[in-house]
């Protein structure tokens, strides 16, 4: 169960990071809305409050994030899981909190993660991720992860930092998507389920070079519902936050897992992360 949980957290974070790091121009066709594109008859005040179409919002967000050099993201993930294996059943709650400081080029990431699973001691992990190494601290011990174990993960992280047409994937669910506004933010809302969300996740993960294990996990999923909410600042057109709620089930090796999950991510410190310095004890662990 823990392996499945960890894999799925990474899948969701890859999508979330890609949305904040996108640097290409997309041409997604917006769904039908009541927001006409013509300004005829509108007063200046009306024009100022007009909600952009999906295409306009994606284009402006791409332009803004292309110039962004660094940012911080924080995520909180709550999962309620039920595992059935024959006549045995197990319920488990998992709470994960994650904070990442990210410099895009050259890629440098510092992250702190805490995972709490019911009935187990909380696990705290600190990591520094560069373009070719991962230094990890569990407890008081720093270790340099062997290159053979990190190469694929680093390539996936690089792809998420500079995706090719990442938001273009939302065309696959445009009939389930609408643009609204809340306070200082524009909001992209998507309510999807079944094959639509599975195809969206597959397309994004294939583009980010996800491994065979992640693809196999997606093939086994039956997602009954998934709601996504992307908040984009009206003034800067930079991502502000994302909310994801999902109910899904999957089977593997005769075991059936049902999961109810809520994930909230926030983005801040745009262009304010100036330096990430790896501590000497972490560097010494690679010697």
Model regions: which residues?
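C-terminal motif of bacterial Sec signal peptides marking the signal peptidase cleavage site
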Residues: 16-19
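Sec-dependent N-terminal signal peptides
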Residues: 7-12
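Positively charged n-region of N-terminal signal peptides that target proteins for export
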Residues: 1-5
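Subset-of-secretome marker
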Residues: 21-287
